[in-house]
From Swiss-Prot:
Catalysed reactions, as listed in the record: a 1-acyl-sn-glycero-3-phosphate + an acyl-CoA = a 1,2-diacyl-sn-glycero-3-phosphate + CoA; a 1-acyl-sn-glycero-3-phosphocholine + an acyl-CoA = a 1,2-diacyl-sn-glycero-3-phosphocholine + CoA; a 1-acyl-sn-glycero-3-phosphoethanolamine + an acyl-CoA = a 1,2-diacyl-sn-glycero-3-phosphoethanolamine + CoA
UniProt keyword Membrane present: yes
Name of the protein this chain belongs to: Lysophospholipid acyltransferase
Gene: ale1
Keywords for this protein: Acyltransferase, Endoplasmic reticulum, Lipid biosynthesis, Lipid metabolism, Membrane, Microsome, Phospholipid biosynthesis, Phospholipid metabolism, Phosphoprotein, Transferase, Transmembrane, Transmembrane helix
Role of this protein: Membrane-bound O-acyltransferase that mediates the incorporation of unsaturated acyl chains into the sn-2 position of phospholipids.
Residue intervals on the Cytoplasmic side: 36-55, 116-223, 268-410, 463-509
One GO CC term on file: membrane
Length: 509
């Protein structure tokens, strides 16, 4: 059967000029929809639902992609995590699991780098599982701590007992997100597989308690297919390798940046398509359910991984990153960024750099990843400085109401964000060190020069001067508001009030 199933993929591959494994991946994306519909209608017994999820996941890996060794890789990571988390009760437990699982994922990237192939391998699934397993380890660790030491997010994610092995393997091989994500925490899977996330919707007169999700699921499916069609069309018109040609090198600088932005946008379409398709299957299965909105309609964004509109029109780096690969960003934030920082202290540049370094290792071994993510760490720091020390001048003194030029600030921010990210993404796409540096050189290293200048400015006395001006505006506003409130206060009320001095406002932080 393993060979018979290849026949239609090889036939259409020669007909369409597409690699068979790409067609297999598309088949898995689309077939996940009817399988998700079946999963949703299975008896509510968790063991049945878990076994079905595991069976379809193994069918994709072994039956479709023939990744026999890959299944062993995933099983090793899963069982190592499960037993270490269960029996090693130490504060070092989550770090040991994190290092081993990330290191194993990185070693798979190294092997793929040394022996490149167009065939699908296990690394993509291993990357997804890396997020799930390391998050699982932290959830087990948090479950052994007093609630008083946990944040509200950690309390919700904490596991007070080790789950049944069947539940855990169902989580590992959950088929709608097995190949390209999205990743999510174990508690979400358990609440889904036991149907407890739907209990508030239960109707004693209806057999099915999960809300209907066919319409939003099909919406994601059509959008995903549209993005993939646009990617195939756009990549033939705006090929990435054009950036390495003499024609690109001889183009005017504005035309170069325009081409870079379009090329980066076309490259993103592939990710938009894959993530929309997998999100649709998750929605149809029910795990995408995220409660009710203010109109009492179901929300389907629990495992949403991308918001193309928010990303493309983001007016700052923070908003852009929050809209891209959203579940990976949640993982990086909750299980790297916040965990690296010492308890009681706010995360700083160390956490930022550690997060982007882990992100680069998680993506692969190619130099382009490290060029992108290390540069992104610095540009995110510059964006924080800008938001903290420049943005207030475009707000009214109450620091909430937009000033007359706030819209101009937002437009400039949107253009700068898109240009900066497109510039940095080039090395992520090219991967090769020499080629990445070559393209950046053709772009005059403008973004990197801006980063250096901005860091120098914000770490000079200029920052203190900006802060003093902001503080002066705020204090003047507070004093003026106080004086106005005094004018509207009766004499009797004033006798019962302690009047603050001007110094109280000047010393206000």
């Amino acid at each position: 059967m393993a060979y018979l199933i290849d026949i239609p993929f090889e036939y259409f591959s020669s007909f369409l000029g597409v690699h068979p494994d790409q067609l297999k991946l598309l088949f898995c994306f689309l077939s996940a929809y009817p399988f998700a519909g079946i999963l949703k209608r299975l008896p509510s017994a968790p063991w049945i639902r878990n076994l079905f999820s595991i069976s379809i996941g193994l069918f994709y890996l072994i039956g479709v992609h023939h990744l026999y060794d890959g299944v062993l890789v995933l099983l090793f990571d899963a069982l190592f995590t499960y037993f270490v988390a269960a029996f090693y009760r130490s504060s070092r437990m989550p770090w040991i699991i994190f290092i081993v699982i990330l290191g194993h994922t990185f070693s798979s990237h190294v092997i793929r780098y040394i022996y490149p192939s167009e065939n699908t391998d296990i690394t993509a699934s291993q990357m997804v599982l890396c997020m799930k397993l390391t998050a699982f380890a932290w959830s087990v660790y948090d479950g052994r701590l007093p609630s008083s030491e946990l944040s509200s997010y950690q309390k919700d994610r904490a596991l007070r007992k080790i789950p049944n092995i069947l539940y855990f393997l169902g989580y590992v091989f959950f088929f709608p997100s097995l190949l390209v994500g999205p990743a999510f925490d174990y508690v979400d899977y358990e609440r889904f597989i036991t149907l407890s996330m739907f209990k508030p919707l239960a109707d004693p007169y209806e057999k099915q308690i999960t809300p209907h999700s066919l319409e939003p699921a099909l919406g994601r499916c059509w959008r995903g297919l549209l993005w993939l069609i646009l990617f195939i069309t756009g990549s033939s018109i705006y090929p990435l390798k054009f950036l390495l040609t003499p024609k690109f090198a001889s183009s005017p600088i504005l035309l170069k940046y325009g081409y870079v932005c379009i090329t980066a946008f076309v490259a993103r379409m592939k990710y938009y398509g894959a993530w929309e398709l997998s999100d649709g299957a998750c929605i149809l299965s029910g795990i995408g359910y995220n409660g009710l909105d203010s109109s009492k309609h179901p929300r389907w964004d629990r495992v949403k991984n991308i918001d193309p509109i928010k990303f493309e029109f983001a007016d700052n780096i923070k908003c852009a990153l929050e809209a891209w690969n959203m579940n990976t960003n949640k993982w990086l934030r909750n299980y790297v960024y916040l965990r690296v920082a010492k308890k009681g202290k706010r995360p700083g540049f160390k956490s930022t750099l550690s997060t982007f370094t882990v992100s680069a290792m998680w993506h692969g071994v190619s130099a382009g990843y490290y060029l992108t993510f290390v540069s992104a760490a610095f540009i995110q720091t510059v964006a924080k400085y800008t938001r903290r020390h420049v943005r207030p001048f475009f707000l009214k003194p109450d620091m909430e109401t937009p000033g007359p030029f706030k819209r101009v600030y937002d437009v400039i921010g949107m253009v700068a964000t898109n240009l900066s990210l497109s510039y940095l993404i080039i090395s992520f796409l090219l991967l090769n060190l020499k080629e990445s540096i070559h393209v950046w050189k053709e772009l005059y290293f403008i973004v990197h020069i801006y980063i250096l200048i901005a860091l120098a400015v914000f770490n000079s006395p200029i920052r203190s001067k900006l802060d003093n001006k902001i503080r002066s505006r705020v204090n003047s506003y507070k004093l003026k508001s106080y004086e106005q409130s005094m004018k509207s206060t009766s004499d009797t009320d004033m006798l019962n009030m302690s009047v603050p001095k001007r110094e109280d406002f000047e010393n206000d932080e």
